Every structure is written in structure tokens, then in C-alpha cells.
Amino acid sequence: MQQERDHKRDCCKLMPQTVKAFFKCLRFRRSSSSSSDMVKARARNEEKEEPSSIETSTRSLNVMRKGIRKQPVSSGKRGGVNDYDM
């Protein structure tokens, strides 16, 4: 246990002061974000979701088209069975 604590302290010492200050700034920004900022962020996220839903629907249509497409009739070269009557 003592060795793990010492190791954690060493890791923290390796991190420069500027990086620590940067993380503190990020934490402060997150905690200080007002409710109006949250509403704006939600509105932006909703706007971004609409095109993605359209993209997924077009993708699903493309997948369905591939499934509807008939498989080519085997020529019999590899031992396949022909669908048509001779």
C-alpha cells in the first residue's frame, strides 16, 4: 500500500504545473457553466442529431437494396446448381 501511494505521488510530481493549472481551469469551467449555456448546448446537440438520423435511414435503405438484389446464377464451374431448366 505504501509503495502505491509513493508511486502516485511520483506521477503527480512528473506533471508540470502548467498542466495542473489547465486541468483546474477545465474543472472550474465545467462547474461554473450556467443553465443558459446548458440550454444552448442542448439545442446545438438536437440540431446535430437530425442529419445523423437522416444518414442512418439512407444507410439502412442502402443495406436493404443490397439484400433485395438477386444473387448471380451459378455457371456450374465451381459445382454450383443452376436455377434455370435446360
UniProtKB/Swiss-Prot annotation:
The record marks 76 as: Required for ligand-receptor interaction. Residues 31-86 are annotated as: Disordered. Residues 39-51 have a biased composition (Basic and acidic residues). InterPro entries: PEP (IPR035176). GO terms for biological process: innate immune response. It comes from the Eukaryota. Residues 1-59 form a propeptide. Keywords: Plant defense. Elicitor of plant defense. Belongs to the brassicaceae elicitor peptide family. This is Elicitor peptide 5. It comes from Arabidopsis thaliana. The lineage of its organism: Eukaryota, Viridiplantae, Streptophyta, Embryophyta, Tracheophyta. The gene is PEP5.
